[in-house]
From Swiss-Prot:
Organism this protein belongs to: Allorhizobium ampelinum (strain ATCC BAA-846 / DSM 112012 / S4) (Agrobacterium vitis (strain S4))
Function: Specifically dimethylates two adjacent adenosines (A1518 and A1519) in the loop of a conserved hairpin near the 3'-end of 16S rRNA in the 30S particle. May play a critical role in biogenesis of 30S subunits.
GO cellular component, one term: cytosol
Gene label: rsmA
Protein name per UniProt: Ribosomal RNA small subunit methyltransferase A
GO molecular function: 16S rRNA (adenine(1518)-N(6)/adenine(1519)-N(6))-dimethyltransferase activity; RNA binding
Length: 275
């Protein structure tokens, strides 16, 4: 991509700006520009799209998104050390990159979303990735402000996102994602793709909103899944006792001797709607 966008190699950028990845910020920089292009392509057609990126670091994925035609990239970066490197990219793509120094967990993405297609594409910091995903699944208005999420996670988290009933990885995250989105794992990334290499394999997950999820109140579904999977090895009559236990399950026509990991998303919604 150096030839494609005329910007220097990322290793030169991080050396020039003294950007060592900080463990406290969950940083692992993705420096292979072929891989960043692959991630950006997984998000689909970027033409006319505004893309939110979280934790751009030295800007490898940012460059790919812009080179592949994103109308605008809004990058949220907490680490002020990365801002000069991102400013160089902004100079190269005038008017197409907006960098906001701040904490993504405290950012109101919906308030910043313009009219037109909106995608969220990010190599998420490991320590906040799951919470950010849950935040993006939670807007009361649905379909949401975003058209797709293309996100990098530890592979174990990716497996939990796409898991369905009777899968060992199935849990609260799988229910919430399965309820409101269609999700699939696009491809894996070895630790060697990152600097410094993490101890685990990473994966890229692509999620699109279901146009009409099963009607259900978010708060009730969250409360139910927390109780059910908080004691996942117990029968539902025991794990859901504080919420109504056997009587609740009988009303929902669910066998009280079943365990949480056997319930489909539809069955979870059926119980939640009775709370």
């Amino acid at each position: 991509m150096a030839a494609l966008d005329g910007l220097p190699p990322l290793r030169d950028v991080i050396q020039r700006h003294g950007l060592d990845a900080k463990k406290a910020l969950g940083q692992n920089f993705l420096l292979d520009l072929n891989i960043t292009q692959k991630v950006a392509r997984t998000a689909g057609d970027l033409t006319n799209a505004t893309v939110f990126e979280v934790g751009p670091g030295p800007g490898g994925l940012t460059r790919a998104l812009l080179a592949l035609g994103a109308k605008k990239v809004i990058a949220i970066e907490r680490d002020s050390r990365c801002l000069p490197a991102l400013a160089e990219i902004s100079d190269h793509y005038p008017g197409r990159l907006e960098v906001i120094e701040g904490d993504a967990l405290k950012t109101d993405f919906e308030a910043m979303a313009p009219d037109g297609p909106v995608k969220i594409v990010a190599n998420l910091p490991y320590n906040v990735g799951t919470q950010l995903l849950i935040n993006w699944l939670m807007p009361r208005q649905w379909p949401p402000f975003w058209d797709s999420l293309t996100l990098m996670f530890q592979k174990e988290v990716g497996q939990r996102i796409v898991a369905e009933a009777d899968d060992d990885h199935y849990g609260r995250l799988g229910v919430l994602c399965g309820w409101r989105t269609e999700a699939h794992m696009a491809f894996d990334l070895s630790p060697q793709a990152f600097t410094p290499p993490p101890k685990v394999t990473s994966t890229v997950v692509h999620l699109t909103p279901r146009p009409a999820p099963i009607p259900c109140e978010i708060a009730k579904l969250e409360k139910l899944t927390q109780a059910a999977f908080g004691q996942r090895r117990k029968m539902l009559r025991a794990s859901l006792k504080p919420l109504g236990g056997e009587a609740l399950l009988n009303r929902a026509e669910i066998d009280p001797s079943r365990r949480a990991e056997t319930l489909s998303v539809e069955e979870f919604c059926r119980i939640a709607n009775l709370l």
